[in-house]
């Protein structure tokens, strides 16, 4: 009888050992939190989910990340500071939601005539690598990404000429507020999560945003017209950062793995912006939305209206003790080399 029990005891002891090792491994795993303002169903949130899973997979479970989409951990405008102060370990939001805090990176958001999110994403990361701006030194930048061309979107009134912009209120942020003002509109600076209700309530006549927002933020339900002013299209730069202390505490091999994943994912974000722009425009038109083009002569008027914004921004950088000419010229040169 004793001989019969020996194999069973060995199996039980083995299982107990495995369970103990597993419990210890789980207890020793690094647990991080990730705050993100995009809705859970948005393609950008899906990319955050897949990034978190990839980190867990490649580190063999040594790092586990809890993702909080839809502003459930920190609000969009509080996300950066929330990471710096440790309210979340990682965060994804918009640099321009913290006004005037990121002057160098704000250059990317100027009306330079972007044609794609993939290009805008590449420009943002190249500018960061070139200048390593001090404004981002209180966090560890994982990577940056940027959406496709932002256009003029309205509810109830079509914008076909520059004069049609006069007096219209547009939800916008950052450099886009300067663009709206230069075109004759009135900027209403609030984060994107508030856009839908703002337009629906009549407190804004529209918004400046890329086509993806018609589906990703359901704005096709409250906007009727898109004015395709590609000649002055701008982008918005998004950050993905981690708390510096949390980053510095990670083992070196894990840092290497995460950096490799970052390089892969920033490309995916840029490509996703372009794919979702196509889907967003289809969604908009399926809801009865109308796309309005600009004649070349009219486009030239729009371009002239915003031209001073770039020069003024260069001057503002100089006033901060930064080399505005180098920063702006590098951004424009990099963009032109890619599109």
Predicted features and spans:
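Intrinsically disordered and other compositionally biased segments
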Residues: 6-7, 26
């Amino acid at each position: 009888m004793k001989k019969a029990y020996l194999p069973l005891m060995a199996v039980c002891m083995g299982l107990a050992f495995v369970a103990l090792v597993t419990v210890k491994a789980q207890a020793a795993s690094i647990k991080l939190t990730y705050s993100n303002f995009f809705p859970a169903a948005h393609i950008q949130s899906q990319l955050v989910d897949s990034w978190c899973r990839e980190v867990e997979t490649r580190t063999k479970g040594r790092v586990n990340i809890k993702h909080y989409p839809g502003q459930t951990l920190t609000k969009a405008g509080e996300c950066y500071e929330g990471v710096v102060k440790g309210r979340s370990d990682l965060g994804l939001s918009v640099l321009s939601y913290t006004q005037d805090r990121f002057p160098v990176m704000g250059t990317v958001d100027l009306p330079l005539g972007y044609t794609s999110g993939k290009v805008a994403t590449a420009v943002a990361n190249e500018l960061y690598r070139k200048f390593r701006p001090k404004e981002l030194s209180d966090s560890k930048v994982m990577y940056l990404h940027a959406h496709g061309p932002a256009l003029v979107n309205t509810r109830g009134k079509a914008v076909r000429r520059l004069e049609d912009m006069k007096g219209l209120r547009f939800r916008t942020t950052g450099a886009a507020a300067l663009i709206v003002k230069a075109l004759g509109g009135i900027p209403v600076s609030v984060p994107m999560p508030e856009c839908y209700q703002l337009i629906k309530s009549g407190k804004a006549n529209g918004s400046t945003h890329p086509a993806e927002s018609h589906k990703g933020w359901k704005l096709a339900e409250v906007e009727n017209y898109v004015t395709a002013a590609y000649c002055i299209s701008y982008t918005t730069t998004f950050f993905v950062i981690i708390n510096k202390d949390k980053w510095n505490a990670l083992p070196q091999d894990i840092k290497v793995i995460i950096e490799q994943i970052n390089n892969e994912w920033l490309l995916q974000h840029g490509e996703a912006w372009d794919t979702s722009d196509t889907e967003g425009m289809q969604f908009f038109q399926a809801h009865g939305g109308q796309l309005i083009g600009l004649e070349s002569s009219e486009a030239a008027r729009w371009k002239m209206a915003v031209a001073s914004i770039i020069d003024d921004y260069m001057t503002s950088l100089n006033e901060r003790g930064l080399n505005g000419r180098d920063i702006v010229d590098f951004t424009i040169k990099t963009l032109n080399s890619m599109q």
